[in-house]
């Protein structure tokens, strides 16, 4: 069958589509078109499978719309822009922010772009995402950032989601020079949080996880000064020994496990900040009577939707890097195998990258 083209683009494309709990399929979909003058169409060069995609598949994100194309973490090349897009043009290499924001509403004007009245987590949740050959990006001037010439697609790939999330988690933890910072979870966000904590001045970073491979990955890339194999080693005792019995000056919870929220506040010293960037599939309990007297500050939130330009600059300068997270690659045609392997954490899979596109 002869492939049809309009404006030098195919009419249809392959895409990973969410059809309901436990039901994700690779199927044929129309190539997206401009719907609003603030839109851009991007050819996807690299995309990933994220833990948030697994949460959608597992039914833990009720606002996700059945029938949408999954995916929100990608880089690519702009192929078309709407008439009101002024910062972008066809041919630009761009990194995408996983959050959609308008830049003009009540919250955006105050810098709280994650709470945009016209956006939020839209791509791959409420509207079609990037696990496809092309994607439409609303408010493109806000949601797409040009990639510096010296930065590769794969170096920039995680800027708009897991690096932004990890950096946000570290930044809201109020880390002071020389602090002991405990990071729970050596998954992609946790590893990014650890690297960000180092950049922000942490003196000792302790990473806690049940996966020995991921802990070794943290050590190899100098993200951790101390690692704790949870369930085998005692995280609370380790942190106390490092801090003269006080506890961590800041804790970043990036695991989202059944017992990791409790571990987070137990690791923290009195008057510490506990930063929660994990996404939980079950409700958590805040046992105030047990915590009374610790005077803890809890801060929560996901990706910082305004940080992409800053993070790309830090990547360009060599201050932060994330390319070591890529353990598996495949074309889009094999994405269902990616969901299986990434979801089961088989073969030491940290990030599965979809490599459709001609350049790195």
Can you describe what each PLM-predicted range is?
Residues 2-13, 233, 262-266, 305-360:
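C-terminal hydrophobic helical "lid"/dimerization subdomain
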Residues 1-75, 133-135, 139, 230, ...:
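Short N-terminal strand-loop motif that marks the start
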């Amino acid at each position: 069958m002869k492939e049809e083209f309009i404006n030098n683009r195919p009419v249809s494309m392959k895409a990973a589509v969410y059809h309901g709990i436990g039901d994700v399929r690779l199927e044929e979909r129309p190539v997206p078109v401009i719907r609003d003058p603030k839109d851009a169409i991007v050819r996807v060069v690299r995309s990933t499978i994220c833990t948030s995609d697994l949460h959608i598949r597992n039914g833990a994100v009720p606002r996700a719309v059945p029938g949408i194309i999954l995916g929100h973490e990608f880089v690519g090349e702009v192929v078309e822009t709407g008439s009101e897009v002024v910062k972008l043009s066809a041919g630009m290499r761009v990194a995408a922010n996983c959050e959609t924001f308008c830049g003009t509403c009540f919250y955006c004007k105050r810098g709280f772009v994650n709470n945009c009245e016209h956006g939020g987590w839209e791509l791959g949740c409420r509207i079609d995402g990037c696990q496809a050959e092309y994607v439409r990006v609303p408010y493109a001037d806000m949601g797409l950032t040009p990639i510096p010439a010296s930065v590769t697609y794969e170096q920039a790939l995680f800027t708009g989601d897991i690096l932004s999330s990890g950096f946000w988690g570290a930044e809201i933890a109020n880390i002071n020079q020389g602090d002991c910072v405990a990071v729970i979870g050596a998954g992609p966000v946790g590893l990014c949080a650890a690297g960000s904590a180092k950049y922000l001045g942490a003196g000792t970073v302790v990473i806690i996880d049940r996966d020995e491979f991921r802990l070794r990955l943290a050590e190899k890339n100098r993200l951790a000064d101390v690692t704790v194999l949870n369930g085998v080693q005692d995280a609370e005792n380790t942190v106390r020994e490092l801090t003269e019995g006080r506890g961590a000056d800041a804790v970043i919870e990036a695991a989202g496990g059944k017992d990791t929220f409790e571990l987070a506040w137990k690791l923290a010293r009195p008057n510490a900040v506990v930063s929660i960037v994990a996404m939980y599939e079950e409700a958590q309990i805040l046992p105030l009577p047990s915590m009374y007297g610790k005077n803890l500050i809890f801060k929560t939130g996901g990706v910082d939707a305004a940080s992409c330009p800053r993070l790309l600059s830090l990547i360009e300068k060599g201050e932060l890097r994330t390319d070591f997270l890529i353990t598996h690659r495949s074309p889009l045609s094999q994405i269902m195998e990616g969901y299986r392997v990434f979801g089961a954490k088989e073969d030491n899979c940290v990030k599965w990258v979809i490599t459709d596109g001609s350049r790195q």
